[in-house]
Amino acid sequence: EIAEKILDDLDAAPPPYPQWVSVAGWSLMGAAVSILLGGDWLMSLLGAVTAALIISINTWMGKKELPYFYHCVVGGYMATVPSALFYSLATRAGTSIVPSQVIATGIVVLLAGLTLVQSLQDGVTGSPVTASGRFFQAILFTGAIIAGVAGGIQVADLLGAGLPPIETQPPTPSYQSAIVRSMGGVFAAAGFALAVYAEIPAIVATAATAFLGGFTYYAVLIPFGSGRLFATTLCAVMVGLAGGLIA
């Protein structure tokens, strides 16, 4: 009964920050993820706008008590249609953007709220039933995002703002500096922590852990010839271990 009362009090407690602060955190995360994906300042700006748009609409849908499945469908749609319109306008203006980076940024923002990592953590810590439920939920919501993106592509084609063919090779990053890309990871992690109403000490710890992983990846492992798969795995283990110890 005591535990149930504590949970009820936590659920009824007001958030520590206003809603616009959370939206700003998501925008910061979207801007930073665009940098990590190789975008420039314009792509970063579009990523921030897209993230804010997705979260604002999802917040409104949450107030209407719509299931989160539909949040993912609409979020995938909103990640695609604006990027197609931005691409069409940029082409007419004589400049260029990479719409796939904007779409990927929106997808990352949506995936950040899923429970895949939590399901794996439950499995590792001996809670297989909860892990199975959360894993199925993550798969279901991922399918909803894919459906939203597919629908957005079809609508963009109908509006005459079709997307370019997908490149088989990722574009050259606009910022090659290991420090800049590491800081992109720092701002992405800190933005997400702020978006989910973490306290200031938790945000600082999140940023420090992200810098440890990002700097190790971009400044140590990759320059010395480590494979991307091994580097990603090692940094993920480092971040997970550091986060667990700090928590």
Language-model region placement:
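Alpha-helical transmembrane segments and their membrane-interface boundaries
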Residues: 2-247
